[in-house]
């Protein structure tokens, strides 16, 4: 047991050996739920984030136990490499979930090759990093990997994110906790346009893959918003609003890396 930077504490009731011992019993769901509750109690950054519904009757406890056995019997790593392995496993499952969801999956997951390209271009070595449509937090994870590859100090960055979907907001919190990255995602999920969680933030790096061509984004309620420094965005398309929102939160001499639909800079759609 120890305390260190960017480490969350795993209490006795949440430790892997206790979960494994119960994996083939009918009580495995109760044990996993208790583990989640214990983790949240000891780690304030996880409070209200972890799922605690594994004891529900409709969940097949044998299948849950089999999944635990797969991890126990096939993933072997030391403490020093555990975080990296768990992070890659989590990223793999996020990618699989996104593929299963099809187009909808793109709302919470950006392919790692796209994220790596953005990170390599803007090079977020140190400073404040912001993603106003952060999904599951992939931009931040790749930023931390970039810093590690270049022998930088992860403690020299501050991470800020916002996500509209409450379930995806929780995924991002878990993703960054697993990877040992401290982050400020606001006190809840929220709409970046109508409920800006970081209204005074000026970030050194802004990275995002916001949803394309959103037509119903409530632009008619924000016509006098101070973020629209380059003109009022069309009410029928949020692309220009996303760009201005990011520019508004960009510090002097900051850098932006974003993914938007073709023609976002020239389209008259929605005017």
What does each of the following model-derived ranges do?
Residues 1-125, 184-197:
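Non-catalytic, mostly N-terminal accessory regions of nucleic-acid modification and defense proteins
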Residues 41-47, 63-67, 90-95, 147-152, ...:
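Short amphipathic alpha-helical segments, especially helix-boundary/capping motifs
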Residues 63, 85, 89, 110, ...:
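Helical mechanochemical/support elements of P-loop NTPase systems and associated helical scaffolds
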Residues 104-208, 213-217, 222-224, 229, ...:
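Conserved S-adenosyl-L-methionine
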Residues 118, 169, 187, 234-271:
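Conserved Class I SAM-dependent methyltransferase catalytic core
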